[in-house]
Amino acid sequence: MLCEEAPPVGSIAGKTWTVNGKLFSRSYRMIGDHFAKIVNQYGDRPAVICKQQNDRATYSSLDARSNALARGLESVGVQTGDRVGVMLGNSMEHAVATYALFKLGAILVPLNPSFNATQVVSALAHLEASHLIISTESNLPRKDPRSNIPLLQHLIPDLSKTRIDSELVPSLKNIISVDNSSGRVNTSDFNCLTAYKSLTSDATPDKSALPPRNLSPTDIVNIQFTSGTTAMPKAACLSHRSILNNGSQIGDRMRLTPEDVVCCPPPLFHCFGSVLGYMATATHGAAIAFPTEAFNAKAALRTVQEEKCTALYGVPTMFIEELSLLDEGVIPNEGFQYLRTGIAAGSSIPAELMKRLHKVLNLTELTICYGMTETSPVSAMTTTDDPIDKRINTVGRLLPHVEAKVVSLDDHNNILPINTRGELAVSGYLLMKEYWNDPVKTAEVMIPDSDGKVWMHTGDEASMSPDGYITITGRVKDLIIRGGENIHPLEIENCLLTYPGVIDASAVGVPDERYGEAVAVFIIHREPESEAADEDKIRQWVREKLSNHLVPKYVFFLQPSESFPKTASGKVQKFKLREDAVKMLKEKNNFG
């Protein structure tokens, strides 16, 4: 038996909510072991499709390619437990490197391709990384490709040397370069770089398994840097057990099968792409299709059409951009009949957007995921057959073998009753092991209760219904406290999204002499110069639909081409909007 079955029925135990279900049995608790079984079962099935590269791999081919790369990496010194930075877009090289490192027992450290030199150095030095796999160019959404040579020269001033010599990252032994520049970047004089192609050859498939490693299911296999909605990213350490089971359970909720093809625009350097995407498909023998290295709405829709995709992933801003292309006739509204499911995550999905995705893209079984990097990442999720109101107003119920409680913001030991708002805390197999080499930050969020059970305190305000559905009402730090009353930005934002012409909206609190904080809203409107985009009309709209204390004092309009500052997972970085609001108000001399 692959899985140990238990009734997938929730039950309230005291004041916490627990769910039983299945976890992978002892034989398949390491990712490499489980992948070998999938290859044996579904070897001829498509595993990875990279449209931009015109490259695709079956499970057998992915196994052979990752074996070859693993041996190549081993030949340049990669060992079990080494931290290996991978700074690549959604590409075949990234997909192959993922399993090569898992098989070696090395630790995959995905790095955002948009990182600048300072960020890369900080990440590699913090983890004492031994190797870096990096593309010659970084492809970023809505931008021209960026050469990574200046970044490498910052890391290693003299790239012509045959040996790596980096004062900034002394632990660094080797840099493997992936040439994705189509001839725009010449690395022939950089002797300290090892070409990715020199480590593996597609012409000689390596079907022989690697020698067994002495690995444990609780070994760290992946270190993910948190998105950073409020502060500098932290390095969350995830295990074989946590991401293997999380990916499997996500796929179960979507009812994935080997016949499914998942279009995955979200990035592999983030848990959305790597666990919700790649691990979910790989645990079910399904295929994952990457349209481009970085998000491109046209390419995503064309991939769905050409590959007859059955699932589409995205954050709300991605879906909005895709629907706009269809509205404008840039992409013909056809070829989406095979779509049925997918995942919307990163931020709450407005009701109108959900309805349009059902109607226009046939995503009638679209699911909603909730989680955080530190929980591998998903702790709650809707099912494909949950009523639409549950998929709009909640983030679903807990995944199997996850426990949750809602606690007082003032006292973490005070578990609040059902239907009461407080901070959500979760426990179970999915918790990270720690923030790498940061016991202080780890202790701030991973807090044991009186029985010694460790809980991850999410920083999200939530409530839980009697039947286990969780509603996220916002970040605790994003609550606007006006005159001692808590205001939830999401309530205002959902109201604004129903105003004609509004594409996106975000509410933040700004300092106010009388009330402590006042409500400020940022609005992206289709016609920002029109009569409809009027501050007083916006205030009147909110006043008519909500109570007076929720009416924004300040209204800021952005152009349709602009976007809010967001993390890699699509979460709005409200602290940056708050800073912008304060700056603009000071310039207008509206307050001190």
Where on the chain are the PLM-derived regions?
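Structural core segment of the AMP-binding/adenylate-forming
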Residues: 2, 76, 104-194, 527-529
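Conserved structural elements of the adenylate-forming
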Residues: 63-68, 202-208, 217-222, 236-257, ...
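Conserved AMP-binding/adenylation subdomain of ANL enzymes
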Residues: 244-261, 269-311, 321, 325-326
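Gly/Ser/Thr-rich phosphate-binding loop
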Residues: 191-200, 309-314, 323-390, 403
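Conserved pre-ATP/AMP-binding loop-to-beta segment of ANL
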Residues: 43-46, 168-182, 187-225, 231-232, ...
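Conserved AMP-binding/adenylate-forming core of the ANL superfamily
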Residues: 27, 44-99, 116-121, 191-200, ...
